[in-house]
C-alpha cells in the first residue's frame, strides 16, 4: 500500500508538472500573440499610405477595400469610420519632430480651415479614450475656436489650463489627436494628402 501511494503520488505530481508546463507555454504564446498583434498595428500606423509630417491617414478607411490590418486599426482607435466621401480621418501620434505626444509636455496645434463642411480636432489618451477633465472639454471644432485676424487658430494641448483654445492633456502616458473632416470637398476626397493640416509643435516638458 505504501509503495502504491508513492507511485500514485509520483504520477499526480508528474501530471501536475506537465499541466503547469502546458499552461506556461500557453501563456507565453498568448502574450507573444497579443504583443505581435499590437506591434503590427503600431507599425501599420507608422507606414500608412498617406503621411503629412505628424499626421497619418488612408483613403481606404471606411471602404470595402480596407484590409484586415486597416480594419483592426479602425476598431482599435474607435473611429467608426465612414467612407472618404462622407468623412476623412487624420491621426497624429507624434509632433513635428516625430516624437510621441506625451502627457507631461505642452504643444501648440497651429492651423487653418480644412476644405470640408465640418471639421473637428479631438484629443485621446494612449488607450484611445477621451481624456477626463473638469471642463468636459474633449475637442474643438471649426465654429468654437478662437482665431486671429487671418482666420487661423492655435490650440494649446497641455495639463495646465490656458486662457483660450485649451485642450487638456492626460495625467500621464502618451496621447493622440484625431482630425475629422466631414463632407470634404471632392478634390480633397480624391487626394486626401492635399489637405493643409495643422502643425504640432512641442513648447516644453515638465
Language-model-detected regions and their locations in the chain:
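A compositional/structural signature for long, glycine/proline-rich flexible linkers
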Residues: 7-206
